[in-house]
Amino acid sequence: MVNVFFKQQKFVIKKRFNDFNGFDIEENEVLWFELINPTPNELATLSQEYAIHYNTDHSQRVSSVTKYWEDSSSVTINAFFTNQDENETFHTEMATFILSNNILFTIYYGTLEIFDSIQKKVLASPKKFEDGFDILTKIFEVYFEKGVECLEWINKQTSLLRKNIIFKETSTHDDILVRLSNLQEFNVTLRDSFFDKRRIITALLRSNKVDSDTKNNLNIILTDFSSLVESTTVNLNSLDNIQNLFASQVNVEQNKIIKLFTVATMAMMPPTLIGTIYGMNFKFMPELEWQYGYLFALIVMAISTILPVIYFKKKGWL
C-alpha cells in the first residue's frame, strides 16, 4: 500500500494507491511517499520511476539498522522505532527513509503508531511542510514526544514497583521479577533507539543537502534526544536500585526462614537428648521403675523445649 502526500495550492492532500495504479500526480507536487508493507511491484515501480534502490533482503536490512549514507542524488537512512502497545508491551520496527529530489520515501513493514501521528500533523498544518526534509524533521520531533511519554510511564511503573516491594503488596516474587525485567528491557531498547536518532541527526547536520533552517531545527531535536538519553540512564539506575532492594528483601526473608529452622532445631535438641538418655535401656535406671517416670520425662522434655525459646525471645532472635 502506498500513501502519497502532495501539495495542492495551500493544502496537503493524501491519496492511497495500490501498485501505483492510477498515479497521476506531478513529481514537483509530491512531499512524501509512504510505503506500508510494500509489494514487489510497488518497490519495482519505485525503483524504475524515481531511481530509488531498496534492499529487499530482510536480513541485510536488519544488519543495516542505524546506518546512514548518501550519494550525489539521495540520502538513505535505516532506523528503528520502539512502539509501546496498549497492553503495556512494546515492539520494535525498522523503517527506511530515502530523500531524493526533496521527496521523502518511507518504507516499513508492520505497524508504527508514530506515522499515524505524522499524517495528522502534516494534513493539519500544511504550511509547515515544504519538502521531504520538513517531514523527516517532524518525524524526529514526534518520536521525541513519544519517547517522553514512554519514559514517564517507565518512571511511574518504577515508583509503583518500589512501593510494591517495600510495603509487600500482593505481587509474588515471580511477578515482581517479570515486571522489573520488562521495565529494564523497555528502557534499554528506548535508550538504543534514542542513540540511533542522535547518530542519524548528527549525520544529517554534516550533509550539504540539508538547508540551514532544517539544520537549526535538527540541532534543537538533537539536544532533546540527548536529554532523553540522560533520562534513560537515570531510569536504569533507579531500576538497578530496585533490583538491589528486591534482592535484599529476599535475603531478609530467607534469613528469617533459616533463623526459624535454626531456633526450632536448637529448641528440640534438649528434649531429644533427654529422650535419647531414657532410650538407652540400661538395666539400672531408677526412673524406669518409678510410677511417674514417664510423666516426669515428658515434663522435663517440655520444659527443656520452652526454656530455649524464652531465651531466644529475650535476646530478640525471634
Curated annotation (Swiss-Prot):
GO cellular component, one term: plasma membrane
UniProt subcellular location: Cell inner membrane
Gene3D superfamilies in UniProt: CorA soluble domain-like (3.30.460.20), Magnesium transport protein CorA, transmembrane region (1.20.58.340)
A GO molecular-function descriptor: cobalt ion transmembrane transporter activity
CDD domains: HpCorA-like
Membrane topology, from the record: Multi-pass membrane protein
Positions marked as site (Essential for ion permeation): 255
Domain of life: Bacteria
Keywords: Cell inner membrane, Cell membrane, Cobalt, Ion transport, Magnesium, Membrane, Nickel, Transmembrane, Transmembrane helix, Transport
Entry's transmembrane regions: 260-280, 292-312
Broad class of the protein's primary localization: membrane
Motif (Probable selectivity filter) on chain: 279-281
Record field: catalytic activity: Mg(2+)(in) = Mg(2+)(out); Co(2+)(in) = Co(2+)(out); Ni(2+)(in) = Ni(2+)(out)
Pfam families from the UniProt entry: CorA
Family: Belongs to the CorA metal ion transporter (MIT) (TC 1.A.35) family.
Domain notes: The central ion permeation pathway is formed by the first transmembrane domain from each of the five subunits. Mg(2+) binding strengthens interactions between subunits and leads to the formation of a symmetrical homopentamer surrounding a closed ion permeation pathway. Co(2+) binding also induces a conformation change. Low Mg(2+) concentrations trigger both a conformation change within each subunit and a loosening of the interactions between subunits. This results in an open ion conduction pathway. In addition, this results in a less symmetrical shape of the whole complex.
Job of this protein: Mediates influx of magnesium ions. Can also mediate cobalt and nickel uptake. Plays a key role in the adaptation to the low magnesium conditions predominant in the gastric environment. Alternates between open and closed states. Activated by low cytoplasmic Mg(2+) levels. Inactive when cytoplasmic Mg(2+) levels are high.
Oligomer status and interactors: Homopentamer. In the absence of Mg(2+), interactions between subunits are weakened, and dimers, trimers and tetramers can be observed in vitro.
Protein name: Magnesium transport protein CorA
